[in-house]
Amino acid sequence: MNSIKDRNGLDLTEAEDIKKRWQEYTEELYKKHLHDPDSHDDVITNLEPDILECEVRWALESITTNKASGGDGIPVELFQILKDNAVKVLHSVCQQMWKTQQWPQDWKRSVFIPIPKKSNVKECSNYHTIALISHASKVMLKILQARLQQYMNHELPDV
């Protein structure tokens, strides 16, 4: 990427300036979806049962292979090669997260990849952005999604 426009329409050509512009753009783009993760005003103290090893195993097996890694660079295939050892380690981490309600900082980071969708590639808004997240983070996200889906199916069966 040779250049991109800043928010005022001026061309940015330095790699560091372009990187900062993309960071600024993605933060603005997703800001409306953010909330304060450290705000525990409405925390429900009656948590669901502990994370189970079988949930971790299922989540790990359901992650698609041959996909790009997130910021940690760990491919899902490594977890699948390590099998039970990976399940035990990820179970321990997921269980700790569940009990403390704290997401590891490294798991909060995503690598954003801009993909041009229009001919004017100097405007950030003319790109789709995809976010690469760590496969370890995907394990916990899949567990949470499955639990929420089960809850929704029970509470709203006809929707």
What are the functions of these language-model segments?
Residues 141-142, 149-159:
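Electropositive, glycine- and tryptophan-enriched low-complexity nucleic-acid-binding patches
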Residues 1-125, 131, 135-139, 143:
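Surface-exposed loop/turn segments and immediately adjacent short secondary-structure elements
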Residues 125-126, 159:
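Short acidic, glycine/proline-rich loop/turn micro-motifs
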